[in-house]
């Protein structure tokens, strides 16, 4: 099975406000990398964190073993601690009275994780990790582009 490493980051200028995401995919066998970035005019930082992971996984054309590195506790914890699966099983409710946010994005992410063998790893943001820092640069740039269009 092909192994891929993905770094992602999201950014938002205001929360909500214009936002962006950046991701870097690396084929572990060849070292070949691909950068992607995107954004939305009115969004939240958590939506951008999720969308970065979703868009990166969506590029994979066949099932892969994937390691995802993110500085988002929201994404990393929800996936590694099973929260997202629990929210889905409970009809996208975190508790009896508290709905999960971004259910349509979580559904997309969980569906992609059924295709691929995915592990999530949290990394400290704005630290000495060049891949995470590059993703942050792309996310901030996209957020800036949407703010200037605004």
What are these regions (language model features)?
Residues 11-18, 54-134, 138, 143-145:
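RNase H catalytic domain
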């Amino acid at each position: 099975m092909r192994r891929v490493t993905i770094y992602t980051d999201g950014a938002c200028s205001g929360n909500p406000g214009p936002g962006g995401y950046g991701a870097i995919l690396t084929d572990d066998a060849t070292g070949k990398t691909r950068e992607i970035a995107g954004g939305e005019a009115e969004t939240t930082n958590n939506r951008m964190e999720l969308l970065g992971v979703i868009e990166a996984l969506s590029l994979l054309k066949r099932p892969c073993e994937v390691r995802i590195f993110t500085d988002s506790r929201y994404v990393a914890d929800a996936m590694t601690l099973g929260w997202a699966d629990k929210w889905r099983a409970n009809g996208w409710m975190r508790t009896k009275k508290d709905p999960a946010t971004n259910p349509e994005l979580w559904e997309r992410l969980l569906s992609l994780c059924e295709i691929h063998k995915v592990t999530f790893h949290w990394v400290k943001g704005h630290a000495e990790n060049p891949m995470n820092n590059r993703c942050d640069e792309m996310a901030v740039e996209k957020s800036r582009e949407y703010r200037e269009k605004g």
